[in-house]
Amino acid sequence: MIILFDVGNTSIYTGLSNGTNIDETFRMNTDIHKSPDEYFVTLKSFIDPNVITGVIIGSVVPLVTQALIALTEKYLKLKPVVIEPGTKTGIFVKADNPREVGADLIANAAGLDNPHPTLIIDLGTANKLIYVKNQMITGVIIAPGLQLSIHALDGNTALLHEVDIKVPKKYLGNNTIHCIQSGVVYGTIVMIEGMFGRIREEVGEDFDVIITGGLSSLILEHIRLDIKQDKELVLKGLLNIYKKNIK
């Protein structure tokens, strides 16, 4: 089995693949203080390490990247594929400094299975809108994610506190909890809807839209756009990149 690590700032979205399909997924908490040994103990609670024959790491957290590399080499006796400059991805990047482009953006783009221009909406710690055409990332929008927005209100105001991410029944709230939920959740929905129109004006062409990420189901239910969902898009991209880099 091939293990696919998508390391985000909040969690490590992990997939297991037979080389063709994504067979199983699970999440581990991202913790920059965890040692390779501790991550291995956590990993063993999900999968028998003896069945792992390949590893790929796509990460936006350098300390965790190093921990997973050490885990792979020490316990699995394997050399992992790591998405970094020089790794074959099949994705081109239109950017002032391509080295700054996150592994998550590249893996999402690599997960697409059609040649049509596509806007990928990835909802995580940060919300990313990634425009891909002809296997090239031509532009990206990054905004605070839902949980990050709630943390910001909780951490920087005296009277507003952290609330659960839920969709309130109406836009105009009548208590603090519903007011925050409306601002964060509906605010994200309206941001996406508004950016969709502005992006279409800018690119001057029709495009597919795919939504992914841990909170994609919540947003998809209420957004007024024709969108397809693919929760495993980033893992599919990691698998495609892995195949390009094994001998």
Swiss-Prot record:
Q: Which GO MF terms are attached to this record?
A: ATP binding; metal ion binding; pantothenate kinase activity
UniProt: K(+) binding residues: D122
Gene3D superfamilies, alphabetized: 3.30.420.40
- Residue positions annotated to bind ATP are D6, V7, G8, N9, T10, S11, I12, Y13, T125
Work out whether the entry's keyword set contains Nucleotide-binding.
Answer: yes
Tell me the keywords, alphabetical order: ATP-binding, Coenzyme A biosynthesis, Cytoplasm, Kinase, Metal-binding, Nucleotide-binding, Potassium, Transferase
Keyword check for Metal-binding: yes
Pathway, per UniProt?
A: Cofactor biosynthesis; coenzyme A biosynthesis; CoA from (R)-pantothenate: step 1/5
Provide the catalytic activity annotation.
(R)-pantothenate + ATP = (R)-4'-phosphopantothenate + ADP + H(+)
CC terms in the record's Gene Ontology section: cytoplasm
Task: List required co-factors.
Answer: NH4(+); K(+)
Q: How is the cofactor bound?
A: A monovalent cation. Ammonium or potassium.
Which residues does the entry assign to the active site, renumbered to this chain? D104
Which processes are annotated in GO (biological process)?
coenzyme A biosynthetic process
Query: Listed disulfide bonds for this chain?
Result: none
**Subcellular location, in the record's words?**
Cytoplasm
What EC identifiers does the entry list? Answer: 2.7.1.33
UniProt-listed CDD domains = ASKHA_NBD_PanK-III
InterPro entries for this protein: ATPase_NBD, Type_III_PanK
Provide the binding site for substrate: G102, A103, D104, L105, T176
Similarity field:
Belongs to the type III pantothenate kinase family.
PANTHER family xref list: TYPE III PANTOTHENATE KINASE
Q: What does this protein do?
A: Catalyzes the phosphorylation of pantothenate (Pan), the first step in CoA biosynthesis.
The record's section on HAMAP family has: Pantothen_kinase_3
Quaternary structure and partners:
Homodimer.
| Protein name as catalogued | Type III pantothenate kinase
Which organism encodes this protein?
Acholeplasma laidlawii (strain PG-8A)
Classification from the root reads: Bacteria, Bacillati, Mycoplasmatota, Mollicutes, Acholeplasmatales
Q: Which gene encodes it?
A: coaX
